[in-house]
A protein has these predicted regions:
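Charge-rich, low-complexity N-terminal segments
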Residues: 1-110
Length: 110
């Protein structure tokens, strides 16, 4: 299953500093691979994280996203800027054709 997953910072404040974004993205990609989830596209902005992911049938999306949020907070602390994510997340299932379109658009942003 392909899905776009999005979560925001606490109160949508710009808590992800520009110099920490690449580190957080790299950390999210590595964590996805450890969780056996395919990261198709990953983008972190000042106020949110947006990922296009390929899940396996046995995955619990909620458990994966919880692990990703916690792991990305750790990556940001290592980069020197703590992040506080807001509770919850949005998830939208994607068709195979929509995956390509969203991944390209996500990579072109910011």
């Amino acid at each position: 299953m392909y899905a776009e997953v999005v979560w925001s910072t606490f109160d949508r404040l710009p808590l992800v500093a520009p110099e920490a974004r690449a580190s957080v993205e790299t950390g999210l990609i590595a964590l996805c691979r450890r969780l056996d989830v395919e990261p198709v596209a990953v983008k972190v902005s000042a106020t949110r994280a947006r990922l296009v992911l390929r899940f396996k049938p046995a995955h619990s999306i909620g458990a994966v996203v919880t692990a990703l949020k916690l792991g990305s907070q750790d990556a940001a602390v290592v980069a020197g800027r703590p992040i506080r994510w807001a509770p919850g997340f949005a998830c939208l299932s994607l068709s195979v054709t929509e995956v390509r379109r969203r991944a390209l658009r996500l990579r072109a942003r910011h």
